[in-house]
C-alpha cells in the first residue's frame, strides 16, 4: 500500500513532471466559475467515484507514452528531416490549446502546413487546403502529425483518449453541457475523432451552403462531436481507452 500511495502522490501532484495534471478532481468551490453549472457538478460526482480508474488511466498514459516515444524515435527523426528539408521551417507546430479546467497548454504536432498558416486562413483545415505542404499531406494521410502529442501525454497535458483539445475560440462557444468535457484531460483520440475522421468533408458541404469554415464547425460539427465526448465521462476506463485506441488504428489503416 505504501508504494501505491507514493505513486498516487506522484500522479496527483501538479508540480511533478509526470504528475496527474488536470485529473486531481476539484471540489465545486475550486472549479473555475465559467465551468460551474448543473451539468459539470453532476459529472464531477460521477468522476469522484472513479478516482482509482483515473489513477490507473494516468499510469497507463505514462508507461505507454514513454515506451512509444522510444520505439518511434526513428520515425521522429525521419519526419523531422523531411519537414526541415522541404522549406527550412520549424519541425513542430506549437499552438495554444485548452485542457482540464480551462488550463492553456501548447500542443506538439509535426508541422504539415506552411509557416504562419494560422494567419492565412481559418483555424479548421480542409483536405484541399492550399496551406498544406507536400510532405504535410502525406503525414496527415496517416495522422502522423499527431505523434508528437506523446510528449503532451507524458508530461500530463493530455491523455491518449479524451476530448480533442480546442483553441480558446471554440471553447468560448461551448454550451454549459459541453463544459463537462473540461473535467478530464484533452486526448489524442476519442470516439468522436473516429466518427468525424472525415470532418473536413462535412465542413466543405456546409460551406457549399453558405457557411464559413468556422461557422460550420461551431454550429454544425462541434455539437455532434461533443455528445460523444460527454458520454465518455460516464464510461471512462482503461479498458475503454484501449478499445478506442485500437479502433483508431483500424480507422487510420482503412
Where do the model's predicted regions map?
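Residue-identity detector for glycine
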Residues: 2, 16-22
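Short, positively charged and aromatic/hydrophobic N-terminal segments
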Residues: 3, 9-13
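A hydrophobic, helix-centered structural microdomain
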Residues: 12, 27-28, 32-117, 232-254
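Short intracellular "coupling" helices and adjacent cytoplasmic loop segments at the cytosolic face
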Residues: 22-30, 160
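C-terminal terminal-structure detector
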Residues: 23-26, 183-254
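Short, glycine-rich, amphipathic interfacial segments at transmembrane boundaries or analogous
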Residues: 28-36, 93-131, 192-224
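Positions in alpha-helical segments
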Residues: 65, 80, 93, 133-137, ...
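A short, structured surface patch at a secondary-structure boundary
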Residues: 126-192, 245
